[in-house]
Amino acid sequence: MLDIKDIRLNTEEYKRRLGTRGVKPEEIDELVAEDKKRRELLVETENLKKERNEVSEAIAQAKRNKEDASEQIQAMRKVGTKIKELDEKLAKVEENVKSMAAHLPNLPNPTIPVGPDEDSNVELYKVGTPRKFDFEPKAHWDIGEDLGILDFDRAAKVSGARFVFYKGLGAKLERAVYNFMLDEHAKEGYTEVIPPYIVKSKSMYGTGQFPKFKDQVYQVNGEDMTLIPTAEVPLTNYYREEVIPTEDLPVYFTALSPSFRSEAGSAGRDTRGLIRMHQFNKVEMVKYTKPEDSYNELEKMTKNAGNIMEKLGLPYHVITLSTGDMGFSAAMTHDLEVWMPAQDTYREISSCSNCEDFQARRARIQYRDENGKLQYVHTLNGSGLAVGRTVAAILENYQNEDGSVTIPEALRPYMQGLEVIKKEK
């Protein structure tokens, strides 16, 4: 949620910067006009309530003096009726203001690239050199099916498209990957959390998924409950409507969870493999920080995600997303993309974002500054990493000509020392 007062004071600045995110100028004008109406109604209501209190005192004084107070009583009834009407009108206007503001994305950091889509993203740096194969590299779905460790066909029979069964060493590899990730994040000071996988709408609102993206999640019929699209939701709402003790900041959380996504609007994209699923495991990182520390913490979070890939020996690069490609709640986002040999390109495996105080305003998460004044914290979130995509990257980057897959050294302790996944005879 953006600061309505700041929008009012810097309207043209908000039009310009939010315009780079597809927000039309009239949306800002309508919000400012509705907020003006809200403030005018508030003043009018408060004045009438003050008048009612004065009349009430006059009636009490008249009764003490045993004087006729019928005129004052009649006047107070009229004032009371008017106040009730204004309160109802004010409630509707306040709801309009809240709804209009809730649909506005976060203000982009002024240093990020401006552009309508991913073509405007800017590469920051590369790590690792893509392997040169002396044979034609296969796609991870073919590797997994040939080895008997991934079964997409039976998953489609059971659940439909965009699901998978991990089997045998495939399941063990997935488990090894996320246990390795959690252990690495623990070394960096993250507290491991096992969160709820179903949350209330208020939690989805707090992180910015609701109300704008309700069609992209799975909701429980007849209940105010939603399957989480990411552990960011429960982890960021952990301190909702609380004041975090200043001495506890920064707070680092990490969690493994399934993520459930309807993938609305993704028809025809990544229809095969582990890249775009309705259900997938992801290790998430979430931070609560003081405002002055948040961008330094974003760089550290990006490094934390990158370190996982470096220890797994996976080539990747880091890009800064443009204003038009960035997520709704983010002020700045660094995407980490891993090299996928069969596709001959980099694919997103982690997205690390600084949401500044956008989510904290929606979820009312605060701390006290050095003067004891309540301030909103800054929240950050990042994938550390998407587990299925990491498995896909390992299968493609570590494949051998005979169809086997070498296990990265960092994962072997989690695989009981196994070095190669081979097809069972």
From Swiss-Prot:
Where is this protein primarily located?
Answer: cytoplasm
Q: Where does the UniProt annotation locate this protein?
A: Cytoplasm
Task: Detail which positions bind L-serine.
Answer: T230, A231, E232, E284, S383
Please name every pair of cysteines joined by a disulfide bond in this record: none
Q: Name one GO biological process term.
A: seryl-tRNA aminoacylation
Q: Which Gene3D superfamilies match?
A: Bira Bifunctional Protein, Domain 2, Serine-tRNA synthetase, tRNA binding domain
Which GO terms label this protein's molecular function in UniProt?
A: ATP binding; catalytic activity, acting on a protein; serine-tRNA ligase activity; transferase activity
Q: Name one GO cellular component term.
A: cytoplasm
TM segment ranges: none
Q: Which family does it belong to?
A: Belongs to the class-II aminoacyl-tRNA synthetase family. Type-1 seryl-tRNA synthetase subfamily.
Protein name as annotated: Serine--tRNA ligase
Report which gene this protein is encoded by. Answer: serS
